[in-house]
Amino acid sequence: MYKVLVVAYYFPPIGLSGVQRTLKFVKYLPDFGWQPTVITTGKIAYFAYDETLLNEIKDKNINIIRVGAKDVNALLGKLGTKKPPREKIRKVLNRISQSIFIPDNKKSWSKKAARKIEELLDKEHFDLIFVTGPPFSAFVEIAELKIKRNIPVVYDYRDLWYESYFSFYLTPGHKFRHYKYEYFALKNVNKITVTNRKIKEKLLLDFPFLKHTDITIIRHGYDAEDFEKTPPIAKENNKLLIVHSGNFIEYTTPEFMLQALRDLQLKYPDVAADLEFHFIGIMDKKYQKLIKKYKLELIVKTYGYMEHKEAVRKVKSADVLWFMIGRKKNIDAILPGKLFEYIGAKKPIFGSVPDGAAKSVLEEYEASFISEPDNVEQITETLVEIYNLYKDNNLPVPYSKYVEKHERRVLTEELSKVFQFLLKE
């Protein structure tokens, strides 16, 4: 059995979809000859916790080493789950943080994690280090460690770093420092995995020393076990049920969908009366106020954050799932893991998205409806189209082979092959 160190700040019991990719890799890597040891954060304050996620690997003999630090979340850790700030406040705090901490505010943790890895390497042999980002400060620290120790390293880009859809640069100097850090990190890595082709293309464009063969695309996926072992929540009626699972953050908003539902009530009252829209996840108060303002209480129900297992049950109960990405710079490179949880449910998906990686996935999935993210009239008419197909029992079905290739075990086997080929070089 080969041994791999997995460096991941975001890991259970932290909740939300960002931890799923790494958790599932760790869960299935032993099936392909790789025993992971996880280096992750200690007790921190975070928007959501899901203690049940660790149950997935409790019988896998996975060593999880928790490294504390002095980042803001760690200092608030005694509070446990923290309430997310309102969107305007969150944006301000995020910009302040990005102006002070380069490459990110997890630098303290990343340095401590690297020191812990050095201690481990002094005691036992590991074949490879796998680092997932963000936080990208972990890439920098592991790059420095690689120079010292000459151990093979693989970076996993869950999102873009330089000029990402999340980035804010106070000055050109801030922007240059980010580029310099990423340049250094990429000069000291063996292989790279990314979640979609757009990220790969941007890395190759921004860092011309990289070769196509340096970067492997391993998309997000779904765990078949999550869906096979989890029964759906029974529907309360025969109305068309559309479900959205996930939080609304900087590049997503329910605003245009809520406007479309308002217009649906005015233009197509019979359709609106025979439809329900359920939101799972943290929703800003301003959107909850819109629900009341538009008098949507009979159509829209909000459920707040659910543990992953319960969220899967709710997703399975839906007739159609809604997915949204707004307009932002380089947004074409974003491909949230939530979309592949939807694919795992094998339900029709209504995507309100711009051109980009997510739209391509929806088109390949086939059981999809696509609108512009902010075209309220188009969203309204698409809802009517979906409703009519539902009443005719003629909703589209997904392309089965496309669904199967995004199963987590299949994707983890792809990752194990990246590891194996690296060791042979």
Where do the model's predicted regions map?
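Acidic anion/phosphate-binding donor-loop and adjacent secondary structure
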Residues: 72-78, 204, 213, 221-238
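Membrane-proximal helix-turn-helix segments that form the acceptor-binding/catalytic region
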Residues: 137-140, 144-148, 173-194
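Carbohydrate-associated surface elements
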Residues: 198, 218-221
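Conserved donor-binding/catalytic core segment of Leloir-type glycosyltransferases
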Residues: 234-252, 258-261, 411
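Nucleotide-activated donor-binding/catalytic signature segment of Leloir-type glycosyltransferases, i.e.
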Residues: 272-281, 286-312
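A charged, aromatic-enriched C-terminal amphipathic alpha-helix characteristic of glycosyltransferases
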Residues: 374-378, 391-421
